[in-house]
Amino acid sequence: IRDRFRADGEKVFKERNTFLALEGNFGRLFAGTHDTAFKVAQLKVDLFNDTRADIKYLFQGENRMNSFVAYTTPELIDGLKVTINSISQSTGTFESYSVNYSTGSIKLAFALDSNGKGYDSTRFTTMFPIESLGIDVGLMYQSSEKISTGVSENGHLLSLKKKVSDKGSVYLQTASSDIKLESGKQNSIGYDYKISKIAKVFFHYSDLESDKTSKNAEYVSVGFEYK
């Protein structure tokens, strides 16, 4: 369980995945409550996950589902794995697929959601370092079609993270998407200071803007995270 406390005193409670798994040379079969293959294909490019700057406010597909059955292949070639999800829901079967490739410090993912909470979505993600600058880069592009209307929208994200000391890191993130908010844009900056391997303090600032002015907001978070 992860606990977060924001500066306004509100506690944000987040459950972890809860599932049973069978794993061997054949791959990994698991069932229960789990992040979808589509969500996992985000590759943690969202540096503000589980905060008010989470990309779920702009992008469809950040889902953790119940009634979940999934299979991940063993490595088909070095660094390449495929994950298949089947989730039962009231509107029919929700299927989620991903292809993930990792080599050294470079990661790539391609994912599809079919009938995922009323959307069909495609996502491309990559993470890689710029070693000469000491910066980790995250990039994501997504297209989502609302099944009931046939309207398709897209969005993209760029995140940058750099260590500024042995224990401190600064990070920036910018995202633009029409999927959940028309002309939605979110810019965020954060700083983490590690107290230990399992604890850190953090500061976040985020600005969300869109054509729907009632959703526009600025957020400041100061907190402590223990894993």
Model-derived regions: residue spans:
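Outer-membrane beta-barrel pore domains and translocons
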Residues: 1-2, 34-36, 85-89, 111-115, ...
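Outer membrane beta-barrel
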Residues: 1-91, 100-107
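Residues that define the transmembrane beta-barrel architecture of outer-membrane proteins
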Residues: 13-16, 63-67, 76, 91-95, ...
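Membrane-embedded beta-strands of outer-membrane beta-barrel proteins
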Residues: 18-20, 69-71, 82, 97-99, ...
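Short loop/turn motifs that connect adjacent beta-strands in outer-membrane beta-barrel proteins
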Residues: 26, 76-79, 130-134, 166-167, ...
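Outer-membrane beta-barrel and related beta-rich outer-membrane complex signature
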Residues: 41-45, 151, 215-217
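Outer-membrane beta-barrel "beta-signal"
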Residues: 69, 193-197, 216-227
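Detector for outer-membrane/organellar transmembrane beta-barrel domains
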Residues: 94-188, 193-194
